[in-house]
Amino acid sequence: MAPAMDSAQNGHQSRGSANVLAIGTANPPNVILQEDYPDFYFKVTNSEHLTDLKEKFKRICVKSKTRKRHFYLTEQILKENPGIATYGAGSLDSRQKILETEIPKLGKEAAMVAIQEWGQPVSKITHVVFATTSGFMMPGADYSITRLLGLNPNVRRVMIYNQGCFAGGTALRVAKDLAENNKGARVLVVCAENTAMTFHGPNENHLDVLVGQAMFSDGAAALIIGANPNLPEERPVYEMVAAHQTIVPESDGAIVAHFYEMGMSYFLKENVIPLFGNNIEACMEAAFKEYGISDWNSLFYSVHPGGRAIVDGIAEKLGLDEENLKATRHVLSEYGNMGSACVIFILDELRKKSKEEKKLTTGDGKEWGCLIGLGPGLTVETVVLRSVPIA
């Protein structure tokens, strides 16, 4: 006779919602101020003769509201790999060679910070979820980080390649399902990005390149996710209440990217900003309706900083006070757009600032919050969060 349903589920499922138990971040040591970046960029790409294009790029950088960014690529590395700095040159091999090593390496740095905060042995990690849009290989970066960290060989791995900037939300959604449906699971989530795949020299016929070069940067973030925390050894940071994914209507082709011999080439339509802005409230309503929440200013936020204009558009459509996006704008200013890692950096900034400012909770003193991932598709990931009290 088969066991009763409740009995069967109790053997395999956790009873509570997934929790963020620890957060770690990492960046390459090479930092370039945004005000210096146009000179650097046009020098290393041998494009200083394109004076009009450089002036346009300077204006884009000023409008970005980014102060500095971290990069693996340096002038010396680009000299050693000239194809990466030349628009349209066959350079996929050079890019891949860098990324196959550097993505797991940077991911490991972030993971070690999270594991140290968690305070438990790595033998307790049961699952790995790794997300990146920076290169591809078999076995994947999930395998590499498992080996680098010395995790159990029977750890269950999920590799998320090439989903773009919304993949931080995707990784959290997948980790939530794993943690809640596997009793005792502890999931290591890693999101790592490196501009070695998207770096290109300027081209007068592909101005989208300039937008990306003014915004993209390198970084990795990691979390430990688990349900039913073992208190007091484990200390929850946020509760993950629900997770949703939505394709924005009539947005086909608004953001697309393709891999060619020149690396990843990306294309942006002018209607990206209004498409996100005009549809964000419907995504929020779908996520929060069952909790009776419709006052968007009552929430704390981690919004993917896909550019100043996108953040501004979402703030306007939701009627958000500027304070609600302080952490999002801080990450945009101090790190730029690190793709999938950004929303986790913002969660880290939120909980740290909340403690520094003596707020009552990890969510800037608020109880409920929302993580919003944005990217190609157009795709929106919404993760409903609850903060925890700060002791």
Swiss-Prot record:
Domain of life the protein comes from: Eukaryota
Result of changing residue 133 to L: Changed substrate specificity
Active site: 165
Documented effect of changing residue 339 to S: No effect with benzoyl-CoA as substrate, but loss of activity with p-coumaroyl-CoA as substrate
pH-activity note: Optimum pH is 6.5-7.0.
Tissues of expression: Expressed in young fruit pericarp.
A GO molecular-function annotation: acyltransferase activity
Keywords for the protein's UniProt record, in alphabetical order: Acyltransferase, Transferase
Enzyme class, UniProt record, top EC level: transferase
Catalytic activity: benzoyl-CoA + 3 malonyl-CoA + 2 H(+) = 2,4,6-trihydroxybenzophenone + 3 CO2 + 4 CoA
Annotated consequence of substituting residue 339 to V: Loss of activity
The enzyme's E.C. designation: 2.3.1.220
Swiss-Prot/TrEMBL GO biological process terms: benzoyl-CoA metabolic process; malonyl-CoA metabolic process; polyketide biosynthetic process
Family: Belongs to the thiolase-like superfamily. Chalcone/stilbene synthases family.
Subunit structure: Homodimer.
UniProt protein name: 2,4,6-trihydroxybenzophenone synthase
Originating organism: Garcinia mangostana (Mangosteen)
Gene (UniProt): BPS
